[in-house]
Amino acid sequence: MANLLVIHGPNLNLLGTREPKYYGSITLEAINSNLTHQAAQAGHHLTCFQANAEHILIEQIHSAAHQDIAFIIINPAAFTHTSIALRDALAAVAIPFIEVHLSNVHRREAFRRHSYFSDIAEGVISGLGPTGYELALQAVFARLLPP
């Protein structure tokens, strides 16, 4: 059994009502419930965390290093394009992570096309809606298998 962490960045608490054109109508609670169930079925423990403040997300990442977290799935949301501090926190704890985005950031405004995380992530999934989280979780399961 592995301990896994899903981190959701700013404004993702508004899923279900926020710009459904880009983010769909599913709620964050529904995404978290689905992921938690899938992880439990695979024999893993999954914790989901959301915050709108950068420093709170950083503190969560720092504490992951002391909680035996084997893998992180993160949707940094708007911090993708702005937060060197969040990137540095992920690099500092050296826990492998997959970057997820609900919308296809490459089909949106130009400023959304740059990520401070992609080059240090194990992988990036963008534009597949909530299915992107599920695919990231499946990739995590595959990486946790013994060689």
UniProtKB/Swiss-Prot annotation:
Enzyme's top EC category: lyase
UniProt xrefs under NCBIfam families: aroQ, PRK05395.1-1, PRK05395.1-2, PRK05395.1-3, PRK05395.1-4
Similarity field: Belongs to the type-II 3-dehydroquinase family.
EC number(s) from the headed UniProt entry: 4.2.1.10
Pathway linked to the protein: Metabolic intermediate biosynthesis; chorismate biosynthesis; chorismate from D-erythrose 4-phosphate and phosphoenolpyruvate: step 3/7
Annotated coiled-coil segments of the chain: none
Protein name: 3-dehydroquinate dehydratase
One Pfam family matching this protein: DHquinase_II
Catalytic activity as recorded in UniProt: 3-dehydroquinate = 3-dehydroshikimate + H2O
Annotated positions binding substrate: N75, H81, D88, L102, S103, R112
An annotated Gene Ontology molecular function: 3-dehydroquinate dehydratase activity
Active site: Y23, H101
GO biological process terms, semicolon-separated: amino acid biosynthetic process; aromatic amino acid family biosynthetic process; chorismate biosynthetic process; quinate catabolic process
Keywords: Amino-acid biosynthesis, Aromatic amino acid biosynthesis, Lyase
Lineage summary: Bacteria, Pseudomonadati, Pseudomonadota, Gammaproteobacteria, Chromatiales
Subunit structure, interactors included: Homododecamer.
Site (Transition state stabilizer): R18
Function description: Catalyzes a trans-dehydration via an enolate intermediate.
Organism the protein comes from: Nitrosococcus oceani (strain ATCC 19707 / BCRC 17464 / JCM 30415 / NCIMB 11848 / C-107)
